Amino acid sequence: MIKNYLGRRWLNNPAIQAYVKQNAAVAHSTVFQGNLYEYTVMRELSEKLRMTKLRKTGGAHDGGVDIKGSWPVDDIYWKISSLMPNLEMASNIKRTNSQNGFVLKPLKYRIIDHTFEPLKVLVQCKAFTKSKLSPREFRELVGTFTSLVSHSQRNKTVCIMCSPHMLTKDTLNLINNITLPLIYLRVEMLKEKTDGHFDLINSGKLINYYENSYASTLMQDCKISEWLKLKLYKNSDFNSEK
């Protein structure tokens, strides 16, 4: 129901409001804007993608990761199945697929076999107001992922990059050749209203969701894109933690 979605949204907004109030004196600094963007991203990850256990980790020893959390993708899979039983769930997906030289078992089979465990998520936020992300930022993200995630955990961890801008063609080509599950989220920055307050309702939204080729193969038929496109998060209710 819509009220469940709105209720979840208001649960996330107090953290943003508290941060703004505590740091009003430096509200136009780069550091403030970066932290505010991270709180905004956390809100969208929780509300739109149902990620849980989200926490900010930014700091001198964060290893390049701004947010860590957990993603029970199976919740979305089963919720779509119950809300839209006529939505075709492909049954002819191979048990294993090859992507850029790696053999992958789609998460769907872990879900239906009841062996799935929530994915770990590593999130990096780039609150660039003018410039678009370049391939360099993604190469650095790959370095962060490989330094923090062992080979055996590669398909149990998803790397997420967030920024307010669309990707360039060159950057798209690059990330589709990256041999790890990478998701790009275009999330707006919060807009300041004429009264000086930030618009927590109509800005700071998740605009685009994009899986690279590796993530798309791994998450084949999990229906995340459909979940977002149909705005099914407005009609579902989850526990806040899992």
UniProtKB/Swiss-Prot annotation:
Pfam families: RRG7. Keywords: Mitochondrion. The keyword Lipid biosynthesis does not apply. It comes from the Eukaryota. It is found in: Mitochondrion. Its main location: mitochondrion. One of its GO terms (cellular component) is mitochondrion. Disruption phenotype: Impaired respiratory growth and sensitivity to 4-(N-(S-glutathionylacetyl)amino) phenylarsenoxide (GSAO). Belongs to the RRG7 family. Present with 1420 molecules/cell in log phase SD medium. This is Required for respiratory growth protein 7, mitochondrial.
